[in-house]
């Protein structure tokens, strides 16, 4: 069996994810090491990601390690992976999804409805900002950057009445007790790929692709391929208030996509489509169709598809 090196960010959550993949590969007879790295996205905490390079800042250094041979694969939270990978790189594996929902986290309040008028809520995405404003336009929404532990510490320091985080990250780190409530997708549609892990490799490394094949989860891969197709066709990034979530039942893939106004001035736009899918190509085609419908609906609603300027500190 082969010897493999995993490139990973050094946050506690990123290391958990890399060690999870390491364990699965080790059980299959591979020798697996870790290469921890601090990315530019981890270092820049005082400016909007949209102003300094977007979510690609979290993967660029890892891709360099793949390119120069220091690492064989990189493990990512799929929602943080840019919709277009550089030439020579491939998404070789999508693993079974954890909880895709967003979590309401607070030390004082049980859920969003219980927050007092004008309460301060911290969130790190324009998507969450837009959806929160659609649910509770009275709230004061403030930027929130940093890794998971940093965000929780800011909440505990009293900077926010509540914060919104991905449920998957909290559950993976054994922090489910911090979740006061979860938002159902009907209330807060997740980001494309949320809750799933993606593994990136150099596209010519067929040996690594073959080693990763047993870790792939076909149903999740179909769903997130459709979601990422929506986002790709919309020009989605961390600087667009876009949500996309797909579910598969009896070979029928249903995609919900939404566009919101972070300022809360325009109504939320939501579209849904379903179709039978059998492979990644048909899932991607359905995602592109949903994106076309969403684009038309946004423009008809008076919205703009230009990427938004996130407030300073916003991711």
Curated annotation (Swiss-Prot):
Query: GO cellular-component terms in the record?
Result: cytoplasm
Provide the catalytic activity annotation. Answer: 4 porphobilinogen + H2O = hydroxymethylbilane + 4 NH4(+)
- Hey, what's the signal peptide range on this chain? none
Q: Where are the S-(dipyrrolylmethanemethyl)cysteine residues found in this chain?
A: 238
Q: Coiled-coil intervals in this record? A: none
- GO MF, one example: hydroxymethylbilane synthase activity
Q: Main role? A: Tetrapolymerization of the monopyrrole PBG into the hydroxymethylbilane pre-uroporphyrinogen in several discrete steps.
Q: Name one GO biological process term.
A: protoporphyrinogen IX biosynthetic process
Q: How many and how are cofactors bound here? A: Binds 1 dipyrromethane group covalently.
Q: Which family does it belong to?
A: Belongs to the HMBS family.
**CDD domains assigned:** PBP2_EcHMBS_like
Q: In which pathway does it act?
A: Porphyrin-containing compound metabolism; protoporphyrin-IX biosynthesis; coproporphyrinogen-III from 5-aminolevulinate: step 2/4
Subunit and partners: Monomer.
Tagged with keyword Transferase = yes
Q: Which cofactor does it need?
A: dipyrromethane
Q: Which HAMAP family does the entry mention?
A: Porphobil_deam
The UniProt gene name for this protein comes to: hemC
Q: What is the name of the protein in this document?
A: Porphobilinogen deaminase
UniProt keywords, alphabetically? Porphyrin biosynthesis, Transferase
Superkingdom of this protein's organism: Bacteria
Q: Which Gene3D superfamilies match?
A: Periplasmic binding protein-like II, Porphobilinogen deaminase, C-terminal domain
Note from the entry: The porphobilinogen subunits are added to the dipyrromethane group.
| Enzyme Commission numbers on file | 2.5.1.61
Query: Does Transferase count among this protein's keywords?
Result: yes
């Amino acid at each position: 069996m082969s010897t493999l090196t995993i490139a990973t960010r050094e946050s506690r959550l990123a290391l958990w994810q890399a060690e999870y993949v390491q364990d699965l590969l080790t059980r299959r007879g591979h020798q697996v090491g870790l290469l921890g790295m601090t990315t530019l996205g981890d270092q820049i905490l005082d400016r909007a990601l949209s102003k300094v390079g977007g979510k690609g800042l979290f993967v660029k250094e890892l891709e360099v390690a793949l390119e120069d041979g220091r690492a064989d694969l990189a493990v990512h939270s799929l929602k943080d992976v840019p919709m277009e990978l550089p030439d020579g790189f491939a998404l070789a594996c999508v693993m079974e999804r954890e909880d895709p929902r967003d979590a309401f986290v607070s030390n004082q309040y049980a859920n969003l409805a219980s927050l007092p008028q004008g309460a301060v809520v911290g969130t790190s995405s324009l998507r969450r900002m837009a959806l929160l404003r659609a649910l509770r336009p009275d709230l004061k929404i403030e930027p929130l950057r940093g890794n998971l532990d940093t965000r929780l510490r800011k909440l505990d320091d009293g900077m926010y009445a509540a914060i919104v985080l991905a449920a998957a990250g909290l559950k993976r780190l054994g922090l489910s007790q911090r979740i006061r409530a979860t938002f159902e997708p009907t209330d807060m549609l997740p980001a494309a790929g949320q809750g799933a892990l993606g593994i990136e490799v150099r596209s010519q490394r067929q040996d690594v692709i073959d080693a990763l094949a047993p870790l792939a989860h076909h149903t999740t891969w179909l769903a997130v391929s459709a979601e990422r197709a929506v986002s790709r066709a919309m020009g989605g990034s961390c600087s667009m208030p876009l949500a996309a979530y797909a579910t598969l039942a009896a070979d029928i893939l249903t995609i919900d996509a939404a566009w919101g106004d972070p300022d809360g001035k325009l109504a939320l736009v939501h579209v849904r489509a379903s179709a039978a899918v059998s492979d990644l190509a048909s899932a991607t085609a359905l995602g592109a169709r949903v994106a076309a419908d969403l684009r038309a609906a946004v423009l008809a609603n008076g919205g703009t598809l230009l990427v938004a300027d996130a407030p300073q500190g916003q991711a």
